[in-house]
Design a protein with these regions (language model features):
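Transmembrane alpha-helices and adjacent helix-loop boundaries
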Residues: 1-147
Length: 147
């Protein structure tokens, strides 16, 4: 009995860390799609975020596990772990994207103007000025979502 519990606990930790590893950067990619000036991409990403945040995680996991079989006849019985990681990562990426969006939008416009006056381009402004402040702002929300 104890051996089964430790095996399950180990699997849970692996799922947790892999989900975190994939969903944190994917959330930033989703955020960039969400705020894209290319409207079709922005609409698609907004729909993705709404669907992922608006449906239960268990339903999404069932979709990722059983969906390929019922849609394309693919048997993925040996890929249970992959379906879990994929489903959890895509779900949490949507949540992290919204957390990042709220943190980045909370940065005052004066920060961007000051960076422009100092001669920074957009990527330098984001990575050297905005992102360090955003990390401090979003850390409590990200920690809450991780727990």
């Amino acid at each position: 009995m104890l051996q089964q519990l430790t095996t399950g606990f180990g699997s849970t930790l692996v799922i947790f860390f892999l989900t975190l590893l994939f969903s944190l950067p994917l959330g930033m990619v989703v955020y960039f799609g969400r705020v894209s000036r290319f409207k079709p991409l922005s609409w698609i990403v907004k729909a993705y975020i709404s669907i992922m945040r608006g449906t239960p995680l268990m339903l999404q996991l069932l979709l990722w596990y059983f969906g390929p079989f019922y849609l394309w006849g693919m048997n993925i019985g040996g890929y249970k772990f992959t379906a879990i990681i994929l489903g959890c990562s895509l779900n949490y990426a949507a949540y992290f994207a919204e957390i990042y969006r709220s943190g980045i939008e909370s940065i005052p416009s004066g920060q961007y103007e000051a960076a422009q006056l100092l001669g920074y381009n957009k990527s330098q402004t984001f990575f050297k000025i905005v992102l360090p402040q955003v990390v401090k702002i979003v850390l409590p929300s990200v920690t809450n979502e991780v727990i």
